[in-house]
Amino acid sequence: MPSPPGDPQKESPDSMAVEIGAQGIEALPRRVDRYGKAKIGALEVAQYMAGLPDLQRTAQRVNGCGDYLVFRHYFTVDQVKLHGARLCMKHLLCPLCAIRRGAKALRAYLERWECITAEKPLLRPFLVTLTVKDGPDLAERFNHLHKAQRELWKRRQRARGSPLDGVAGAVWSYEVKRGSGSGQWHPHLHMIALAEHQPDQVELAAEWHNITGDSFVVDVRPIDQADTAAGFMEVFKYAVKFSDQPPADTVHAFLTLGGKRLLASSGCFRGVVVPESLLDDPDGLDDLPYVTLFYRFLEGKYALKGGAHA
C-alpha cells in the first residue's frame, strides 16, 4: 500500500545530505535502513506501473532495483563504500536512485564551490526560488516556467539592467508537485546564485511577473556558509521530491518530463560533471584492506547475508 503523508517509510530528501561525507561502520545500519525505506517506495511505483501496458519493462527494472547491495568496509580507516548494487538508474521514479543521484550532484557542485570561493572569496551563495501559477496541465506549466527562466537569464545577459546582473554563476533545478491548496500542478525552480550582494527580491518579483504574466512569487535568501551543504541540497533534492508523491503522480511526471533537462548551470558553475555511476567513488582507498558486506532485500528490509575479507 502507498505510504500516507508523513509516514516514516517515506524517505526524506534530507537523507541524501549524509551521503556525501565519510561514513564509518557505525553509520552503516542507519544507511541500510534509509535505502530499505527508499526500496519500499520503488516497489510501490513499480507495482503501479505494472498495471500500465507500455511500462511493464520499466516496472520490472524499478522493481528489481536495490535487490542487493555490496559494501566494502575499509577497516583501517573506518570508511564504508557502496561498491556494488543492482540499480535501475531511473532516478525520477526510484527513490533509491534519486538519493544516490542527488548526492552525486550535490558533492560535485560543492567541490566546484570550494574552488570558486578560493578564487573569488567575495562571492556568496544565495538560494533563489521562482514559481509559476498552478495549473492542471503539467507539460504546459513546466514549459511556461522553463521559458520564463530562459527569458530571465537572457535579460541578464543583455546587460540592460536586471536583478540578476551581479550573479557570476548559478545552478538550478526544476521541481514539480501538487499545490497544497489547489491540488493542481505546481512547478517551481530552485537556484543557487553566486553574487557579492544579495539580489533584490522586490525587483526580481516585478521582473518575474513582467515575464510570466501570471506569477510574482519569488524568494531570495542567503545560504549559511557554515552549512553550505544544507542550502545547496534544496537544488539537488529535485529527483527525491519527484518520487515523494503518490505513484500515479510520480509516473505522470516521469512520462511528461523524462526527456527534459531538469538540472542546469551557467557562469562559473558551468561544466561541472556529475558522475554517471551511482556507486561510491573509491577515493584512493583501493589499496587498503577491506571487508565485503553483502545485503539482500528480503521481507521488506535489507538483511546481511554474508561477508568476506580481502
PLM features per residue range, with description:
Residues 1-185, 195-310:
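Right-hand nucleic-acid polymerase module
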Residues 191:
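Cys/His-coordinated zinc-finger cores
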